[in-house]
């Protein structure tokens, strides 16, 4: 994997000559997704660790977590104004919206997954398995049948910086919460640090990041309704992945961190696992989502800032 740093003055605030050198075509298949007259924009900064971006198209805003500051932030697309959405947030991390538009969140401090109702009430979806407390739910997706899938790597209890330091009561796992019975089912327990996760188009595949020592993204067959036949989709070393999203063509967009200048940002993989493109950022990227009026604007929560880029890709 060739790593080419950008000049420092790329992020100095001056206009960028198009096409933006931060958006790199590594395979001809990525050419169709780059808008030559679109540049990476820093839309907000001043955070300790930005995570879990989620788009609210009906409100024209982006929400994300500022985990160490124990708050969630809100960015208004029309005005560019940034405000505090929720504080304290229980050191919330990843978020998603369900089919009804409700916010589903992973909380480190309370070691639970919650849903915010339209009237603002908080419903606890999961906080234990077989009587033992969850570790610290990290990231979450909702499938079309309404099931809530989330990872529980335990980062939020490994120190006091993003929650409260505590002992692990359960293995690190991926869980599925049944929408009808409410049964919480462990579906993957073979990963060291299960982290970001997403479905492919038509939910035929489930991708799960292992941000442990192996630094890999795994893919599972979903034809039975449960993940089977897991295999390594891509090795992310020398860095690692975190949050991931698929576009409608089945490409996997992965946050990338820990690899240094020229690596950190977003890596884009074709369905066959080939790295076809990259978006280089000056900070470690933790998580991403698509949004905007046409769902073609990529939002990137990265270290102390949030970035965006218009693309010709359409997110799921």
Where are the language model's segments positioned?
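Beta-rich, blade/repeat-based domains predominating
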Residues: 39, 45-60, 88-107, 112, ...
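Short, conserved, GDST-rich strand-edge loop motifs in beta-rich repeat architectures
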Residues: 6-16, 150-169, 257-260, 311
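Loop/turn-rich, solvent-exposed surfaces of beta-rich toroidal or solenoidal domains
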Residues: 207, 214-274
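Beta-propeller domains
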Residues: 32, 57-87
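A short beta-strand motif characteristic of beta-propeller blades
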Residues: 40-44, 80-86, 123-130, 182-189, ...
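A short loop-to-beta-strand structural motif that recurs across blades of beta-propeller domains
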Residues: 71-73, 112-114, 172-175, 216-218, ...
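Short loop/turn segments that connect beta-strands within beta-propeller blades
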Residues: 76-80, 117-121, 178-182, 221-226, ...
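Blade/loop signatures of beta-propeller domains
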Residues: 2-39
